[in-house]
From Swiss-Prot:
Gene Ontology CC annotation, any one: cytoplasm
SUPFAM superfamilies, per database record: Ribosome inactivating proteins (RIP)
Sequence positions bearing N-acetylalanine: 2
Keyword Acetylation: yes
Protein name per UniProt: Protein synthesis inhibitor I
Main function: Inhibits the elongation phase of protein synthesis. It inactivates fungal ribosomes even more effectively than mammalian ribosomes and is thought to function as a constitutive antifungal agent in plants.
Amino acid sequence: MAAKMAKNVDKPLFTATFNVQASSADYATFIAGIRNKLRNPAHFSHNRPVLPPVEPNVPPSRWFHVVLKASPTSAGLTLAIRADNIYLEGFKSSDGTWWELTPGLIPGATYVGFGGTYRDLLGDTDKLTNVALGRQQLADAVTALHGRTKADKPSGPKQQQAREAVTTLLLMVNEATRFQTVSGFVAGLLHPKAVEKKSGKIGNEMKAQVNGWQDLSAALLKTDVKPPPGKSPAKFAPIEKMGVRTAVQAANTLGILLFVEVPGGLTVAKALELFHASGGK
């Protein structure tokens, strides 16, 4: 089924910029700023922000841009990311071409030739633990996508390079926004003391977290539901493969929750109403 063409991709709600050579503290500030701007001001879970819901049956219209600069003076690579679910859907190369990861989604864009899921990018989500992350990997990813041209699309090696670059950015920007565990791990790799180590790979628990953002968000939101009179609140259901056994651990793992409707909890309509009433756009 063809994607519904998105609106406002060129009118981002905000733009967050990060210089690849900046400090780990600057990186932490960059990620925290994205979470703060994306949150529904009227919805928190265990003091963690929650995204406003994905509006049903309408084309995506809430976007933000991330500009990643290989050096302070460079123009930078622009990423187009959905503000309702933090999906990376496009990037703009130095020749002004917008490349899209979902065919037909971004007006005027060129399909990159592969999708944005880890299955599309890696062949198997288990391979996430093989992806090296670090400052050099981030710089290489930015350079590869910023320098992409339409002549690269028929080239197998160039397509593979682009897949690897998108995977790196997904982990170091999108997943880092979703998870405090991932952003903390990446910040550690960018720390001056990490010079000898230079790069690192996520472990199995973090891989399970990345693959289970919706499940972990839902599990925490279920504990917020007001119980019937005389009943105690729902206990957090441990997710062993993520290393998350309590609601406190879940809150310490998540950077921002995906909105999920859970029995007895906020409906999509109510959450959207609260979001708009609190000034959300």
